[in-house]
A protein has these predicted regions:
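Helix N-terminus capping/helix-initiation residues
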Residues: 18, 55, 138, 173-175, ...
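Short, charge-rich amphipathic segments
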Residues: 32, 38-42, 74-85, 126-139, ...
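Structural motif of enzymes handling amino- and sulfur-group chemistry
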Residues: 88, 96-97, 104-155, 168-169, ...
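Conserved C-terminal alpha-helix-loop-beta "cap" of PLP-dependent enzymes
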Residues: 143-196
Length: 196
């Protein structure tokens, strides 16, 4: 099994084995090759101006027999674990006695089904999935939102604080894209010690 670093980062002198090489090694030794993508996305996030994250389709094309990923986070659905891959291995998982304890309830299946239907129209994903919409917002758009709310904040905190809009870089969060930063804007609130 290979685990994609979707919600953590390893820094320093590290290396990772290419998935195609691992898949070949597993085939040579008759071992199934599973990749856990963690946060998971079904689309190329670069199309929305976001950093690349591997998709299940890319991972299977690289030779993985099974791919696991989250139904929430980048996918935008309910909290769930999803397994895709070779049918014979999926059948073995279905026969496992633990499957009953880990299966999805009907409400989660309905919610996941509704989100998966959204992916049939990729051009509407940004407007349909709040997480992708938030991640794909341009810094200028976020700055405009800051401009709309800065006066009420300034009025509320009074003269004891200085309130201003600043440029910043935001973390994606939600167990996705560690160490990846997106250009953004923020409201900085700092105390005015001289006015106290």
């Amino acid at each position: 099994m290979k685990v994609h670093t979707s919600n953590y980062a390893i820094e320093g002198f590290t290396a990772a084995v290419d998935e195609k090489k691992l898949a070949q090694l597993c085939r040579e030794n008759r071992i199934s090759f599973t990749v856990d993508l963690g946060s998971g996305t079904l689309v190329n996030l670069e199309e929305f101006g976001l950093p690349h994250e591997p998709t299940p389709a890319e991972t299977i094309a690289a030779g993985a027999d099974l791919v696991t990923f989250s139904g929430d986070k980048l996918l935008g659905g309910p909290q769930a674990g999803i397994i895709v891959g070779k049918q014979d291995l999926i059948k073995k998982i279905r026969r496992n006695p633990m499957k009953r304890a880990l299966r999805l309830d009907k409400m989660t299946i309905a919610a996941l089904s509704a989100v998966m239907d959204l992916y049939r129209q990729p051009e509407k994903l940004i407007s349909s999935i709040p997480g992708l919409r938030a991640l794909s917002r341009k810094p200028e758009e976020i700055n405009q939102t800051c401009k709309k709310i800065i006066k009420p904040i300034s009025d509320w905190v009074g003269n004891s604080f200085s309130v201003q809009i600043i440029e910043c870089e935001s973390q994606v969060g939600s167990g996705s894209m560690p160490n990846r930063r997106l250009k953004s804007a923020a409201i900085s609130i700092t105390p005015n010690f001289s006015k106290r």
